[in-house]
Amino acid sequence: MESQRLEFNRRSVNELILGNDIVKDTVARLLRFRVGRHCAIVTNETVAKWYLQPLLSELKSRGFTANEIIVPDGEKYKNYETASSIINRLCELGIDRDCPLIALGGGVVCDLTGFVASVFKRGVPLALLPTSLLAMV
């Protein structure tokens, strides 16, 4: 497993982690940042079947409570309506500025979650767990 820290300014610290089966390591790294213990995971139906439960289990074992937000599969859902539905769900869940959003999926999920994290409450912490090569670049 490789890690590279990217710091652009005092508020923006990014850590790039490369490796296989990085769920445990990613959750451990979340603990290093000053984030709330409540988080929301954005994923789609396909990815949720394979990877959501291990992530939820690891988060719970580290003291996090997590809610999942499942979005439809497909490029056609990368739009403001879907982003708006995610934002509405975050409000319903009581997510605040310290609560991280975790994107678990391909390009559509990572792009949508990144956009939502940047506009929700003037920005919230974001962790990307890409599951496709395109989402990684």
Task: Mark where each language-model region is.
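ATP/NTP phosphate-donor binding region
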Residues: M1-C99
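Glycine/threonine-rich beta-strand-loop-alpha-helix active-site module
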Residues: K78-V137
